[in-house]
């Protein structure tokens, strides 16, 4: 309206398209959209799987990329998964919500031990911490109850971590403290060899 009153041209584009994503593509301009921008776009279009994703993010304080990984029962955000998410083809498989709820509730139980594990910007778990826990959960010998008990006296160890590899090593040290050799887990090796991707 202001441009009209000032007798300025109003730029617009007319295009023949039935794809609502064209609006998103045009609005990206020079700056690429984040996963959160795409989530907002698809939620505004009332796509149920995206609305579930947003709800679970808020419920557990987990960022969009990690929640997508959890809902798809994966360990990494592969480019195909990312592209499907951006283009509106994200579909939660059977058991995906239950998987996300299980991991999300375990992280919430551990939250009080994770000093500094929240992003100061949005109060969500740090990405590297969530990814390291997803990897740990894939280890065949990992037991959440054992880890939770071990965290009670060793949670300050988390203060030294900054990356996923750091947190993997810290989880391994905390988990293995006081265990006999046969009950220990080799989480660092499990992570380095990417065995978790096959689980």
Segments (PLM) and residue ranges:
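Accessory terminal alpha-helical modules
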Residues: 2-199
């Amino acid at each position: 309206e202001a441009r009209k009153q000032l007798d300025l041209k109003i730029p617009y584009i007319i295009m023949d398209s039935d794809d609502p994503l064209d609006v998103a593509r045009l609005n990206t301009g020079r700056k690429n959209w984040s996963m959160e921008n795409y989530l907002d776009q698809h939620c505004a279009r009332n796509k149920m799987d995206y609305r579930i994703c947003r709800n679970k993010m808020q419920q557990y304080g987990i960022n969009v990329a990690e929640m997508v990984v959890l809902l798809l029962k994966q360990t990494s955000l592969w480019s195909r998964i990312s592209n499907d998410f951006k283009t509106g083809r994200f579909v939660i498989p059977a058991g995906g919500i239950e998987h996300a709820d299980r991991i999300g509730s375990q992280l919430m139980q551990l939250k009080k031990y994770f000093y500094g594990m929240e992003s100061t910007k949005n109060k969500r778990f740090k990405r590297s911490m969530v990814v390291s826990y997803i990897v740990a959960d894939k280890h065949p010998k990992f037991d959440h109850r054992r880890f939770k008990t071990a965290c009670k006296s060793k949670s300050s160890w988390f203060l030294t971590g900054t990356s996923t590899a750091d947190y993997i090593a810290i989880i391994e040290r905390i988990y293995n403290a006081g265990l006999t050799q046969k009950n220990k887990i080799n989480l660092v090796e499990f992570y380095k060899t990417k065995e978790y991707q096959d689980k």
